Amino acid sequence: MSTSEQTNRSELLDRPPRVQNLRQHTVALLRRLGLLPVVDELRLWLKVMKNRERNKKFAALFPTETFPPARLCNGAYARVDYENYYEGGRRSAEALLELMSGHIEAKGARILEWGCGPARIVRHLARLGKDSGMEVFGTDYDRATLEWCKSAIPGVTFTMNGLQPPLPFPDGFFDVIYSSSVFTHLSEAMHYAWLKENLRVVKRAGLVIFTTAGDSDRYKLLPAEIRLYEAGELVVRTVPLEGSPRYAAFQSPAFVRHKLLPSVPDGELIRHETRLQLASVQEIWVVKKR
């Protein structure tokens, strides 16, 4: 984890409770009034203006690289920051390889990022695995994102997926399937359906790696939501369409361990990680297929 990431993590966790509650109550009010889309458009414009020169300078350092349009970048990562997108994606790809180490032979491995967005991680994974003959795939349910990925990112096979299973692959097709902040935008029913589907498309002894908005994201919750969270229930904010950035799900470790994982008898939890990062401060879970 970089120094700036450590600082950001500390700042998030150390915010005064009154400040946290005020912000979350404001967001909840805007959600009820249907004003979040307007606010999001304004925030997007402000992010573009704020980072325009910085992004221009960073892109000049990598003249052969293509960076995603601001709307795609913001929709997937809530940022319009090329350095965060590119360098953060590289670190996440390296973290993913560390999570695989000791379980999956990289040589010739077939790996899928489910919900790849504009290729923040998968573009680097394709490069890191090129010499070992790794086959890299990405799926997403946003058509504009997939079209951009296909036109801009070499070395990765991109395919559409739906909001609901199945994935367009046969049983046991992949050695690893991973997702970064995808379950965090799904209903409880889709948690169970998609984890089962993830395990379907990996080989026996293959890995399913996913992230959740757990204890480090607890500060975002309102008092009533905290009670659900602490009771081991999934907390879901459902006003926007499922799968959209503002459709938010928060998963306590108790929910994952005692409700989600027991729903897949062919999956075995082998690692719960809070040090490495695939999606900011989200917790990482590594499940091995029996």
Predicted regions: what is each one?
Residues 176-189:
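A short SAM/SAH-binding and catalytic strip from SAM-dependent methyltransferases
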Residues 2-6:
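Soluble, non-transmembrane catalytic domains of enzymes that act on hydrophobic metabolites at membranes
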Residues 109, 173, 205-206:
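Surface-exposed loop/turn positions
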Residues 192-204:
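A short glycine-rich, Lys/Arg-flanked "PGG" loop and its adjoining helix->strand segment in the class I
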Residues 165-177:
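A short acidic, Gly/Pro-enriched loop at the edge of an enzyme's catalytic core
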Residues 9-24, 28, 32-109, 114, ...:
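Class I (Rossmann-like) S-adenosyl-L-methionine-dependent methyltransferase catalytic domain
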